[in-house]
Amino acid sequence: MESLKILIPTDFSVQAEFAYLMVKKLEERTPVDVHFLHVLNVPDTVTMDSKGEIQTCGEIDVKYVVQQKDIAERKLENLKLLYGQNIHTHFLLGKVTDAILNFAEKNHYDLIVMGTKGSWGIREKLSGSETQMIARKSRIPVLSLMCDRSDLNIQNILLVHDFTHPAKEDLQLIQKLVKVYNTKFHLLQITSGKVEAEKFRVEENMKKFAALNNLENYACHIINDKDVENGVIHFNQMNNMDIICIGTHGKGGIFHNSATEKLINHLFKPIISFHLN
């Protein structure tokens, strides 16, 4: 079976450890190729050449940057001692979000996994806002989680979507999880109108979506709520999903980015955000 190439951005916090524990959970069913990346947040005027030498225009002390680089590289080496020599570690300079996104796309990762402290994150850590920005901009699926889910038993995966215009989406990662865990796939649409009035139309669209995306073991759900975030939270309270998947495109409408970002910050469930076509 082909391995999943996974990137874990790390600030060496316990949240980054949660991300690794989640990846180890995935490894129980599918091979994984794990890469840790630490980005030292510095202006674009600070650069590092292929030999690791630091250059700067002068507004930042080179010695300070070198010192921080040495500390980070020691911590990355400690990750290998802790998790094994089969993991890969990387160090970059730059703006955290842009560096992570560029590195992930350049190296063709299948998944980015990030631990987050939600909206209460400490500024220097990979806070909820950092994870939000990466989920918003990334064309690679992002799995985010707020706590240790190493005990997770993956049986039910929820896909929250607007099924008004059924289309083929890039669900390769989600379909792989469904296959290796033999899970049930739940399709959910949240409406602000009357459920009974829309139920037949929505379920027909869900069936078309399932056919277009080769989904088999699935169930259809439609609920009424004031917005996507509350709808997902209330549905999960009633049905206890194990992983929640939600698409992003930033074009407005019911599935604009804010719904995903609010869920990343407030829902104590692993969330996979993926880019809609």
Which residue ranges define each predicted feature?
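Structural beta-alpha unit
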Residues: 1-2, 41, 78-112, 213-244, ...
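Residue-level recognition of beta-strand->loop/alpha-helix junctions
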Residues: 38, 91-93, 146, 189, ...
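Hydrophobic alpha-helical segments and helix pairs
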Residues: 96-146
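Small/aliphatic-rich secondary-structure junction motif
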Residues: 1-57, 156-219, 241, 266
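Solvent-exposed polar/charged
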Residues: 25-28, 81, 105-106, 136, ...
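Active-site phosphate/pyrophosphate- and oxyanion-stabilizing loops and adjacent acidic/basic residues
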Residues: 24, 77, 132, 175, ...
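Glycine-rich, Arg-bearing micro-motifs that act as flexible, cationic patches
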Residues: 115-133, 246-267, 276-277
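A short acidic, glycine-rich active-site loop
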Residues: 55-71
